[in-house]
Design a protein with these regions (language model features):
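Macromolecular interaction modules
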Residues: 1-211
Length: 211
């Protein structure tokens, strides 16, 4: 069994003013497990162990893709807290879109925007195959994005303005989201981080309905 634990700890709570919470009650953590089988019989002992230490939990079988592994700040040993924060985004396909259209925009276009316009140092995409627990809320995907600590308190740090990252990711953004070039052209004097924020916000609108 492989695992990764993400909890809403005291450090994450210090940035509660900037958190967007569309899910109630707000989850206090996420446990990622890599199992030989997610079938009920083989998963039962794990579900029992989780139930023993939580008030409530929901489980999902997902297909994980990791376009940007954490090579910059990997934990030095099992049990160490990973540097910074892990932002979790729960996605639902808007009624205005079909599944294939939504998946194509998210994975084959927005991926480059999400990584290239932000100070992300790790990026994971989890497409939900099915819920594995009773009455689990309906989600279509989960995104996990790791950010440096400074990003929790500064838009400038959040929307990464490092030139070395731009050199790699800007060409990919322009190729798979051409509208980014138009946004830059309309804001020639804006600081890079502000332009990145505009590109990110416009790209998100394509496949996410912001409440």
């Amino acid at each position: 069994i492989g695992f990764r634990v993400c909890v809403h700890d005291d450090f994450a709570a210090s940035a509660s003013s900037i958190q967007l919470q569309n899910t109630k009650p707000h989850p206090h953590g996420m446990l990622s497990l890599w199992l030989d089988s997610a079938n009920d019989f083989y998963r039962a002992p794990i579900d029992q162990a989780i139930a023993a230490v939580t008030a409530r939990f929901h489980g999902y079988l997902v297909s994980e893709s990791e376009p940007m592994p954490n090579t910059q700040y990997p934990p030095t040993k099992t049990g160490d807290r990973t540097y910074g924060m892990n932002q979790i985004v729960m996605l639902q396909i808007p009624d205005r879109m079909d599944h294939e259209q939504w998946l194509d925009i998210w994975r084959n276009s927005h991926t480059f925007v999400g990584i290239g316009t932000q100070s992300t140092f790790a990026y994971r995409q989890n497409r939900v195959i099915r819920a594995v627990t009773y009455a689990a809320p309906q989600y279509d995907a989960f995104i996990e994005e790791n950010f440096p600590e400074e990003s929790m308190f500064s838009d400038k740090h959040y929307y990464d303005d490092q030139a070395d990252k731009a050199e790699k990711w800007d060409p990919l953004i322009d190729r798979y989201y051409p509208e980014a070039k138009t946004i830059r052209a309309k804001n020639p004097d804006a600081p890079r981080w502000q332009t990145n924020a505009l590109i990110m916000q416009e790209s998100v609108k394509r496949f996410i309905d912001i409440g």
